[in-house]
């Protein structure tokens, strides 16, 4: 199964981008042994529309353009399900074992994801009740994806 993250906004050069890339590379190395075929990150420029509904619609259209037909969508949303790391790993393993060809995690911009994308998502996931900057959320998501792979591999990285 392929994994992708489609995110609104671009990470600038610096510690966030370096950390995100480190977790992506670590996942690729660990995940390959578990039947995962890599992790791609797609960045989409934020819409410059003045009003929120237009901005969200433009960003949603740009995201949907990158989604293959049979991909499963996971919305990163503050209203989503709060999974612990083991539960998150079990979700990924279950989808892999069901031969889901691709799972795509969607991270909205400053206004969040459009209601249309939230409805299309098979699952909505939250990283707690707090609101996180989308750049920070991307790093946290990539870390959790890597952590999930280490849990599935029996690697000592996860020590809960």
UniProtKB/Swiss-Prot annotation:
- The answer on whether this UniProt entry bears the keyword Methyltransferase reads yes
GO molecular function term, any single one: rRNA (pseudouridine-N3-)-methyltransferase activity
Q: What are its E.C. numbers?
A: 2.1.1.177
- Sorted alphabetically, which keywords does the UniProt record give? Cytoplasm, Methyltransferase, rRNA processing, S-adenosyl-L-methionine, Transferase
Annotated compartments:
Cytoplasm
Keyword Flavoprotein in record:
no
| Top-level EC class as recorded in UniProt | transferase
Reading the lineage from the top rank, the first entry is: Bacteria
Q: Cellular component per GO?
A: cytoplasm
InterPro entries given in the database record: Alpha/beta_knot_MTases, RlmH-like, tRNA_m1G_MTases_N
State the reactions this protein catalyses.
pseudouridine(1915) in 23S rRNA + S-adenosyl-L-methionine = N(3)-methylpseudouridine(1915) in 23S rRNA + S-adenosyl-L-homocysteine + H(+)
Which of this chain's residues are annotated to bind S-adenosyl-L-methionine? 108
Q: How does it assemble?
A: Homodimer.
Q: So what family is this one in?
A: Belongs to the RNA methyltransferase RlmH family.
The record describes the protein's role as:
Specifically methylates the pseudouridine at position 1915 (m3Psi1915) in 23S rRNA.
Name of the molecule in the record: Ribosomal RNA large subunit methyltransferase H
Q: Origin organism of this chain?
A: Rhodopseudomonas palustris (strain BisA53)
Quote the gene name from the UniProt entry. Answer: rlmH
């Amino acid at each position: 199964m392929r994994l992708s993250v489609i995110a609104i906004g671009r990470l600038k050069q610096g510690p966030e981008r370096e950390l995100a890339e480190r977790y992506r590379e670590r996942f690729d190395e660990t995940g390959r042994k578990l039947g995962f075929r890599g992790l791609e990150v797609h960045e989409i420029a934020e819409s410059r529309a003045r009003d929120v509904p237009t901005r969200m619609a433009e960003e949603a259209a740009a995201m949907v353009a990158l989604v293959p037909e049979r991909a499963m969508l996971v919305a990163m949303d503050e209203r989503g399900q709060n999974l612990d790391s083991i539960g998150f790993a079990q979700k990924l393993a279950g989808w892999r074992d069901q031969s889901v060809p691709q799972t795509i995690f969607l991270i909205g911009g400053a206004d969040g994801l459009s209601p249309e994308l939230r409805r299309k998502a098979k699952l909505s996931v939250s990283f707690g009740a707090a609101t996180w900057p989308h750049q920070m959320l991307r790093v946290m998501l990539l870390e959790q994806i890597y952590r999930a792979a280490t849990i599935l591999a029996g690697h000592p990285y996860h020590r809960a």
